[in-house]
Every structure is written in C-alpha cells, then in structure tokens.
C-alpha cells in the first residue's frame, strides 16, 4: 500500500496528482533491465578569510585571491546562485548559456545555530565578495512556498513560518531574491544542462543522502515542492527504506540497497509515468555499482553536475520563469 504519510504532505502534493494524470497518461512503457542505465549526455565573518574554492571537486583547496569574474550587473546570459547546506553556504556567478560557473565559487561555513538572520548575513558575505548587485537565487533545504518556509532540515527550526525571501533581501539592500527548495534547484539544473538535457517530457530527480529529496521537471518546467522522500511505501517512508544513510546504517550491499530503491521507484511509477529518473547525492558517484541492479520500468542515470547543481539551479530561478 502506498500513500502520503500525513495530511500536510497530501496538501503539498495535491496539485501534482492532477498535473501528472493530465500530462503523462498512457505513456508508461516497459524498459528491459539492460537498458536501465541510459547514457548520460570556522565561523565566517567579514574580518576573516573567505574560502574561494575551485569548481573542480578534485581541487577544492581554499585560496584567498579574489574571484576571477566579479561582474555585478545582470545580463540574460548570467545569473547568481547561493546554495544553503547544513555544513556550508556556497555561491557563484553562473553562465546560463552553458550552466557552468564563471570563475570560482565561494564557500563559507554555515553558522551555528543556523538561524534565519545568521544565515542571511553569511549569504550577504558571499554575495558582496563578488560585488553582485542584481537579482539572485537561493536554495533552501526544505519546503518553501511564495518565499515562506514551511519545513526545516539541517537548519534551525526558527526558519519555519518566516519569509526567507524578505529576510535575505533585507541583508542585501533590498536586492531581488528568489528562494526555492534545494532539490528543486538541482532538478532544474540537471534537466537543462546535466543528465536530463537531451530528454523531454517528465523527469524525476531523487537525491539520496540523510533523507531523499526530489524534484519533478515537466517539459523543462519545475513542478515545485514534491516530497517523494515522505511517500509511504509498505508501511515506511521512502527515505526510511532507501536513503543512502540507511544503507550505511545497516551496512547493506549495493544489491540489497538497490532492492529498496526499486520499491521506491515503483511507488513513484504507480503515481505517474516519468520518462527518466536522475540519481543525485554522493552515492550517485558510484552509480555503476547499483543503477544496473534496479528492476523498475523507467531508466535511471547519475546526476552530471554534482556539487554545482544547486548554485546553477538557483541562478536559473532568479532570471526566468522556470516553474509551472
């Protein structure tokens, strides 16, 4: 039996049911297992050093030189993105023609406790270091509707009920801020520039980590605030079955864990008929060890953008209408 675990979750996803049934009816097809893996086209302050990190994940050594491109004016080809995480806050300028960072990104430690004002001040440090004065996008690790935070994960509970968009904008001299869920931002970026760029139709991104985040992209547009990690699958939430943290906790083999992931994917397929699943999170770097073991219908591929996806997706959201 598969159902949404709570009334709140049902309310958040109510709009999805109608959209899915209208747009994807009749498109499910069986995919043989050998086709499953498709080809993948210390506390910060202004007085302290700002760590400037390379976009190359293998060359993340902090440096103290200024960013190589600090243009503070917007154009239709550039945007600025901030990615709020539980341990760090990252930001940079994005070339929106190709979905890549221009120069380096800046990464600061997430303040503890991660209250709205403390995080907003840290975001301002990152933005001001680039001299960026145009609109920007910010990812948030939880549900956000119309700029207002509804849930909190990896940040302080005092976020809930606050207008995060206004709080961050106030620290940036009223710059225009677009705020969206972190998995949604990653889904936007992967759909346009990453693993889903050659696929139209319905794409579902799942990020496997402590929990399971999700994003749904339909014909290039985001259907925001899906919470597939909280789908109930045979008596348990999806993330209690298949988060990568569960694999680590029980020391499961990839084969054992893949069976749990399959159950979650089938549950999603029973509610909608995606054309492609994209796997994100650290475990996606070892996708060749577990994606071929999946037994659901829809092919899954590994995310391509990895650590830059949140920044890129946030920048996209700040410069265009990217949601249904």
From Swiss-Prot:
Binding positions for ATP per the UniProt entry: 83-88
Instruction: Write down the InterPro entries for this protein, in alphabetical order.
Output: ATPase_NBD, ROK
Q: Which GO terms describe its molecular function?
A: ATP binding; glucokinase activity; polyphosphate-glucose phosphotransferase activity
The keyword Phosphoprotein appears for this protein = no
Pfam families referenced in this protein's UniProt entry, alphabetically: ROK
Signal sequence segment: none
Q: Which reaction does it catalyse?
A: [phosphate](n) + D-glucose = [phosphate](n-1) + D-glucose 6-phosphate + H(+); D-glucose + ATP = D-glucose 6-phosphate + ADP + H(+)
- EC number(s) reported in the record: 2.7.1.63, 2.7.1.2
Stretches the record annotates as Disordered: 53-79
Question: What does the UniProt keyword field contain?
Answer: ATP-binding, Kinase, Nucleotide-binding, Transferase
User: Gene3D superfamilies attached here?
Assistant: 3.30.420.40
Q: Biased composition, Polar residues: where in the chain?
A: 62-74
Protein function: Catalyzes the phosphorylation of glucose using polyphosphate or ATP as the phosphoryl donor.
Give the UniProt family note. Answer: Belongs to the ROK (NagC/XylR) family.
Q: Oligomeric state and partners?
A: Homodimer.
Anything else of interest in the record? The poly(P)- and ATP-dependent glucokinase reactions both follow an ordered Bi-Bi mechanism, with glucose being the second substrate to bind and glucose 6-phosphate being released last. The mechanism of poly(P) utilization is not strictly processive and is most likely nonprocessive, where there is dissociation of poly(P) prior to complete utilization.
> What's the name of the protein?
Polyphosphate glucokinase
């Amino acid at each position: 039996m598969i159902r949404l675990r709570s009334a709140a979750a049902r309310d958040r996803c109510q709009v999805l049911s109608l959209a899915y049934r209208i747009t994807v009816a009749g498109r499910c097809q069986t995919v043989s297992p050998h086709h499953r893996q498709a080809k993948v086209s210390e506390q910060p302050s202004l007085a302290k050093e700002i760590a400037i990190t390379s976009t190359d994940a293998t060359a993340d050594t902090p440096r103290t030189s200024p960013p190589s491109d600090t243009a503070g004016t917007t154009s239709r080809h550039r945007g600025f993105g901030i990615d709020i995480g539980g341990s760090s806050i990252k930001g940079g300028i994005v070339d929106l023609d190709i979905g890549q960072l221009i120069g380096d990104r800046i990464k600061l430690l997430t303040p503890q406790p991660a209250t709205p004002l403390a995080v907003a001040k840290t975001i301002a440090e990152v933005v001001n270091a680039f001299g960026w004065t145009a609109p920007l996008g910010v990812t948030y690790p939880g549900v956000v509707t119309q700029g207002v935070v509804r849930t909190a994960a990896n940040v302080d509970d005092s976020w809930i009920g606050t207008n995060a968009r206004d709080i961050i904008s106030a620290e940036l001299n009223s710059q225009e801020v677009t705020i969206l869920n972190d998995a949604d931002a990653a889904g936007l970026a992967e759909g346009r520039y990453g693993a889903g760029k050659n696929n139209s139709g319905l794409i579902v991104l799942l990020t496997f980590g402590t929990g399971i985040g999700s994003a749904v992209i339909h014909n290039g547009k985001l259907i925001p605030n899906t919470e597939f990690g909280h789908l109930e699958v045979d008596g348990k939430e999806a993330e209690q079955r298949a988060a990568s943290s569960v694999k680590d906790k029980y020391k499961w083999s990839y084969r054992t864990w893949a069976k749990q992931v399959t159950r979650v994917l089938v549950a999603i397929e029973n509610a909608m008929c995606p054309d492609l699943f994209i796997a994100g999170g650290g475990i996606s770097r070892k996708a060749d060890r577990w994606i071929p073991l999946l037994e659901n219908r829809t092919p899954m591929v590994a995310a391509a953008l990895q650590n830059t996806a949140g920044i890129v997706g946030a920048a996209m959201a700040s410069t265009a209408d990217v949601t249904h």
